[in-house]
Amino acid sequence: MLAASRSGLSVTELAEKLHTSKSTSSRLLASLVESGLVERDEAHRHFLDVRFWTWGVQAARRLPVLDIARPHLASVVKEWSNPASIAVVRGDQTIYLECLTPSNGDAMFNILSYAVPAYACAPGKAILAFSSDETKEAILSCPLKKFTPQTLATREELSRELETVRCQGYAINRGEYYDNGSFAAAVPILDHAGLAVAAVSFYGLQDEESLQRLIPPLVEIGEVISASLGYGKAVRDVVG
């Protein structure tokens, strides 16, 4: 709950979300603050300490999807000579775990650990569009900061965008977090239940033509990786 709240939570707000008393909520938060896992600001609002994000990144790097995705993504990076990334959503943030860059006809892996608001980047939108209603509502119900003129900063705009992403199967970012003139496209990696566990993306695309050219192979890679995680198996078993 703290992870999904960019503005933090007060004792009363946490008590309401946990359906418990204010005294219980207060004791819990006080214990977490004392242990250094939660920070309290001057307005007595509470936020997760940065070490939670560090632990989250470390845990995410052990996800099986990374081992499955790497060879497929390396292949498409070499073929199209365009950098790509693998990301997950934790709380309200998209955490970029790894990127692959073309290098002398090969693909070079680089470990990342930076975060971007999930609603303001292609991987985040791709994951949110295929997440549970509860996960989407946690983002939609929070204030959405406008980083650039392109940022989807209202509930209505973001809801429409996520529906579009879900229908077409991929997300596009045209400078919604940092407008440097380049584009990015991302597709979700789906588990056996059809929920997104990660996203892969092409970034640094310089024009609309490059964007449209690379979407089909990106979608194909997403489908291949998702199938490796069991997506579609339940349907095939029923039909078969």
Question: What is the role of each PLM region?
Answer:
Residues 234-240:
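Signal-transducing coiled-coil/dimerization helices and immediately adjacent hinge/linker segments
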Residues 47-142:
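Amphipathic alpha-helical effector-binding/dimerization core
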Residues 3, 124, 128, 132, ...:
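Short amphipathic alpha-helical signal-transduction/dimerization elements
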Residues 147-148, 179:
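Intrinsically disordered, low-complexity polar/acidic regions
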Residues 154-228, 240:
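Extended hydrophobic
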Residues 24, 51, 68, 157, ...:
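Charged catalytic carboxylate motif
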Residues 42, 90, 192-193:
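Short, ordered coil/turn segments that flank beta-strands lining enzyme active or ligand-binding pockets
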